[in-house]
Amino acid sequence: MFGQINHFLFLLFSFFFPLSVALGNLLIIIISVLWLFSGKLKEKFHLIKANKFAMACIYFFVLHIISLLWTEDFYKGLERTKKMLEFGIYIPILLSFIKIKNIEKYLTMFLISIGIMVLTSYLIFFELIAPTKGSTINDPTPFMSHITYTPMIAIGFYLSSRFLLSMDSISMKNNKAMTIFLVFISISSFINVFMTEGRAGYVILFILLSLLFFQAFGTNLKAIFLSIVSIAIVFFAAYLSSPTFKQKIQSTFDVTNNFSNIQNSSIGKRLIMADISIEIFKENFLFGTGVGDFEDDYKKIMLKKKLNNEIYTDIASSTKNPHSFYLLVAAELGFVGLLFLGYLFFAHFKLALTHKSMFKKDILISIGICFLALNFSDSYFLGHFSSFLYLFFVSLLLSERA
């Protein structure tokens, strides 16, 4: 009975987590509580222990807990550690109960949610409805900021396209409704990416587009040629037809060309954050400062720099996030933290590459590459929507339950 209830709840989670943080959190907590009280804990823990990726997630989470021993601000550290519950608790739990036979249903529910997001975005763009909180007509990203929205929509494009690649002509004829739905999601989400201001999403879309060609034609010159040509065509078509995309590309070139004023740009501020984060890492190379201490350590170094160099005058004195998860882990958990994070990705790709299903193998590799790239530009493993997105895919596709 509990299995059926959790199956239904995860169907709801698959649909609601891209639309609502509150509902996503509520559903995952209920699923976890039911899992705990549904019995057969010994069997469940055995399944978790046998899954190398689940254990890699737990190791990374436990390192956060251990680092509380040397952090100076215990309560801030506790708050940071809570943001890693997806890795320490939720992913292992989901890996122990999700059944392979239900995976397609969960993915379909996710794509329906993507369809609602895209449709809402178009309605905002064409001024048929008022912009939702945080979105504008020029940046129609409902339910979340463009930092997370655009990569998620790009992944929606990839998933629907990969579904279409796996369908032969007979299955398309037999299930016309599903085929039409997938084509709609693929085309509408592809266009929608260039209607937003999410530069990270642009990069992810181009990466996923290339991967689709390699997954369709194999690793050969044809796939390389088609991916390069298609990216070039899409780039210039988007540049000529999308004012938002054009503006973001031009602003990026303007910043790089006007290097003397780079510190006042978003790119310049990120470079300064990176510089200070590396200083913190060098001072605490092996184990880091401990989770939760980054903001205070950053502030100390920034105040010194402001006294010695006027270019830092207009830069914010503190930040909780250096806009790179790797820099944050390096500063807070040191070289050991980077090793644990590296092992997490290693386990992800190792299990992906040995997966028996080509469909799941392709998606796992693509999701892994996406999050490897995304975490350079921001701390995507800390955001509610983005961490749930990663949780969703790895829990489904790395589950070994029949």
Task: Annotate each predicted stretch with a short phrase.
Residues 6-13, 54-56, 181, 185, ...:
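Loop-to-helix entry and N-terminal half of a specific, functionally important transmembrane alpha helix
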Residues 261-275, 283, 287-333:
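Long extracytoplasmic/lumenal interhelical loops at the membrane interface
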Residues 168, 213-214, 223-225, 332-372:
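Hydrophobic transmembrane alpha-helices and their immediate junctions
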Residues 195-196, 216-261, 273, 278-283, ...:
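A membrane-periplasm/extracellular boundary helix in multi-pass inner-membrane enzymes
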Residues 14-31, 45-51, 62-87, 97-105, ...:
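Interfacial transmembrane-helix termini
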Residues 30-36, 209, 341-344, 364-376, ...:
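Transmembrane alpha-helices of multi-pass inner-membrane enzymes
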Residues 65, 102-135, 144-217, 226-240, ...:
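Alpha-helical transmembrane segments of multi-pass inner-membrane proteins
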Residues 1-79, 95-111, 163-180, 222-226, ...:
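Transmembrane signal-anchor hairpin modules in multi-pass inner-membrane enzymes, especially those
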